[in-house]
């Protein structure tokens, strides 16, 4: 089973990816850990792509969370058996990011590179509320959903996420993935 978890910042991609990895006992790659070096420094693109390719090549099953179009995006979508798109509204994402900040203040969360302390600055708030939701970005999301429609699950709120997770409870066979 290969699962891609995409969506807006603060929507819960990493948490869902971790839960799916635990449920199906398959490795999880958080693309934030690939992209960032300690101190919020960006890695060289080719090194990032190489790490993602190596992860995908060495694992028959995986969960990968994060958007990062330059990091084997087309390959991830093509190889995925299931794509989950976290389409939560901007205010829900901001609230979730704020809660995450309070939970991890002064340290890195487990889905982030060590040395990248959790932050909620004006730049990130702007990203959550506006910059990640441009017409161009929405057009790209629509294209992904149309191209990969039959294997895409769109979750728009916590109730849908809870229902989705409930539908998975007790399943140990990834081929039964809804």
Regions flagged by a language model, labelled:
Residues 13:
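Conserved lysine of the Walker
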Residues 16:
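Hydrophobic positions on the alpha1 helix immediately C-terminal to the Walker A/P-loop
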Residues 23, 128-178:
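NTP-dependent small-molecule kinase module
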Residues 29-82, 88:
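Conserved nucleotide-sensing/catalytic segment adjacent to the nucleotide-binding pocket
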Residues 88-135:
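A glycine- and Lys/Arg-enriched "phosphate-lid" helix/loop adjacent to the NTP-binding pocket
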């Amino acid at each position: 089973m290969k699962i891609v978890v995409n969506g807006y910042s603060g929507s819960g991609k990493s948490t869902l990816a971790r839960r799916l990895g635990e449920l199906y006992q398959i490795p999880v790659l958080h693309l934030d850990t690939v992209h960032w070096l300690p101190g919020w420094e960006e890695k060289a693109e080719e090194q990032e792509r190489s790490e993602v390719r190596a992860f995908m090549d060495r694992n028959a099953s995986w969960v990968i969370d994060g958007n990062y179009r330059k990091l084997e995006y087309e390959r991830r979508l093509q190889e995925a058996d299931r794509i989950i798109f976290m389409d939560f509204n901007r205010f829900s994402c901001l609230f979730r990011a704020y809660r995450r900040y309070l939970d991890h203040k002064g340290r890195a969360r487990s889905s982030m590179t060590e040395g990248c302390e959790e932050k909620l600055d004006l730049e990130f708030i702007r990203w959550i509320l506006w910059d990640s939701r441009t017409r161009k970005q929405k057009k790209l999301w629509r294209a992904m959903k149309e191209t990969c429609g039959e294997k895409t699950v769109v979750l728009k709120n916590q109730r849908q996420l809870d229902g989705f997770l409930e539908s998975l409870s007790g399943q140990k066979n990834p081929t039964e993935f809804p």
